[in-house]
Swiss-Prot record:
Any one Gene Ontology molecular-function term assigned to this protein's record: toxin activity
Subcellular location: Secreted
Tissue and organ expression note: Expressed by the venom gland.
Organism listed in the record: Lycosa singoriensis
Name of this chain's protein: U3-lycotoxin-Ls1q
Family indicated by similarity: Belongs to the neurotoxin 19 (CSTX) family. 01 subfamily.
């Protein structure tokens, strides 16, 4: 009976050790993948097109604002036949950013009151 109990404890210990090693390997792979994605995003962010600049060469190159990415909007100017594309922020996203900023500011005040 003691042998079975000792063997069971040894088996559980080895199983937990092997699964912990496996999870560490997965965590390391996830971290490496995340770091490479962050590096790619930073490299791409340096090449973005600022707001109200021409984005007709690459419609997905608009810069990010505080919360949202600007959108390449194309239109025909009055009296013109050429299409013009510029990076712009849609109004609903502009209002959402303002509301988030005010909520953040109010949250800071509440934290001061009760913190």
């Amino acid at each position: 009976m003691k042998f079975v109990l000792l063997f069971g404890v040894l088996l559980v210990t080895l199983f937990s050790y092997s699964s912990a090693e496996m999870f560490d390997d997965f965590d390391q792979a996830d971290e490496d993948e995340l770091l490479s994605l962050i590096e790619k995003e930073e490299a791409r962010a340096k090449e973005c097109t600022p707001r109200f600049y021409d984005c007709s060469h690459d419609r997905h190159s608009c810069c990010r604002s505080e919360l949202f990415k600007d959108v390449c909007t194309c239109f025909y100017p009055e009296g013109g036949d050429n299409e013009v594309c510029t990076c712009q922020q849609p109004k609903h996203l502009k209002y959402m950013e303002k509301a988030a900023g005010k909520a953040k500011k109010f949250g800071g005040k509440v934290k001061k009151w009760f913190g």
